[in-house]
Amino acid sequence: MTPKQLMNDEEIRRALKRIAHEIVERNAGANLVSLVGIHRRGVPLARRLAAMIAETEHVQVPVGELDIGLYRDDLHSRGPAPILGRTILPELGKRVVVLVDDVLYTGRTIRAALNELSDWGRPSAIQLAVLVDRGHRELPIRADFVGKNIPTAKNERVDVQLSEIDAAQDSVVIVQED
């Protein structure tokens, strides 16, 4: 099946701008907020959110990267050795950490991120921002900030393309799998 575009670059930009405003509003400013992108596509999304917050609030929000490769509960089914990225985190203590990811699906990625984050420190609070929430949760996890809710079937896949990673124009597409 041909991929169906659900969001274009302008719709993604608007959704991220709204999320940035919601983060600031929910936390009474951005002075104690850190953004942590989940490797891969959560990282550029976190950087974009930080830039948008800096633009309106004139505050430099620390941005970190979290690679959950060794914390996944499906390591045994992913092949002999996971490909690991890097984890670089700002100071966590007494800060609100907003985890950032592209798509929220079963909740297992977020569970792994929470487990790894707790190994690095204890923030005052953890919130979750996602560009797309597609439903079908297997764990009791809910995003605090959502760009767009997109109901999907189990045999569909939501793909996010970002210019920083995919060398393509930003888009969100849905693809039916066989």
From Swiss-Prot:
Q: What is its EC number?
A: 2.4.2.9
Q: Does the keyword ATP-binding apply?
A: no
- What Gene3D superfamilies would the database entry show? 3.40.50.2020
Which keywords accompany this UniProt record?
A: Glycosyltransferase, Transcription, Transcription regulation, Transferase
Q: Name one GO molecular function term.
A: uracil phosphoribosyltransferase activity
Q: Which GO terms describe its biological process?
A: regulation of DNA-templated transcription
Reading the lineage from the top rank, the first entry is: Bacteria
Task: Give start-end ranges for motif PRPP-binding.
Answer: 97-109
Q: Which reaction does it catalyse?
A: UMP + diphosphate = 5-phospho-alpha-D-ribose 1-diphosphate + uracil
Role this protein plays: Regulates the transcription of the pyrimidine nucleotide (pyr) operon in response to exogenous pyrimidines. Also displays a weak uracil phosphoribosyltransferase activity which is not physiologically significant.
NCBIfam families named in the record: PRK05205.1-1, PRK05205.1-5
Q: Can you tell me which family this protein belongs to?
A: Belongs to the purine/pyrimidine phosphoribosyltransferase family. PyrR subfamily.
Q: What is this protein called?
A: Bifunctional protein PyrR
